[in-house]
């Protein structure tokens, strides 16, 4: 089974109020994206695909020819960003890891376990989740009675539902790291609604 990895790095990181692109800020002595890239590179069978946007020069200068680059011209959400990699990956990989480029604490071992879990299960998607505080801004992982993930509910959406308190009390949070069965991913990504980035 061939594994590909996509790192989403097209965002501006405007909340950081910096001229430096968010993924290029240093953590632990090196740029955030380099931590994630090296973890993905150790698990992937192909050079990781990095989705870039405006200000891509710094990312390209840092990663050089170790990465394959695709450009997301319009910021229309993470599903759309992932879709930008279809032309370079469709038919080349059996599994596709997708993660954000600003996750410096993500470890290669965690990615390897996620890939193995998706491969061994009958699920088309496997995701990493974390246990956190009820006050977190991360999406909540909602599970059915049998333990299967039924949905991921973002905080803004949870606040508009009748069971807001119940949803926001969930401590299992979506880490934003996924492993997909490749064919399923490419067949279903176009069905996602486009969302203008915040």
Regions found by a protein language model. Give the residues of each.
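Conserved core of the sugar-phosphate nucleotidyltransferase
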Residues: 57, 65, 106-197
């Amino acid at each position: 089974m061939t594994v590909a990895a996509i790192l989403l790095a097209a965002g501006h990181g405007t909340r950081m109020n910096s001229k430096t692109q968010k993924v290029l800020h240093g953590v632990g002595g090196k740029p955030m994206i380099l931590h994630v890239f090296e973890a993905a590179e150790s698990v992937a069978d192909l050079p990781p695909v990095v989705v870039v946007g405006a200000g891509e020069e710094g990312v390209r200068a840092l990663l050089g020819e170790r990465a394959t680059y695709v450009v997301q011209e319009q910021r229309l959400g993470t599903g759309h960003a992932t879709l930008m990699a279809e032309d370079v990956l469709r038919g080349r990989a059996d599994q596709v890891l997708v993660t954000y480029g600003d996750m410096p604490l993500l470890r290669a071992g965690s990615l390897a376990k996620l890939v193995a879990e998706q491969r061994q299960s009958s699920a088309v998607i496997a995701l990493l989740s974390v246990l956190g505080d009820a006050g977190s801004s991360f999406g909540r992982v909602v599970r059915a009675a049998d333990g299967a993930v039924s949905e991921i509910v973002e905080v803004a959406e949870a606040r508009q539902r009748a069971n807001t308190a119940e949803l926001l009390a969930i401590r299992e949070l979506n880490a934003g790291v996924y492993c997909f069965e490749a064919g399923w991913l490419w067949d279903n990504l176009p069905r996602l609604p486009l969302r203008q980035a915040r």
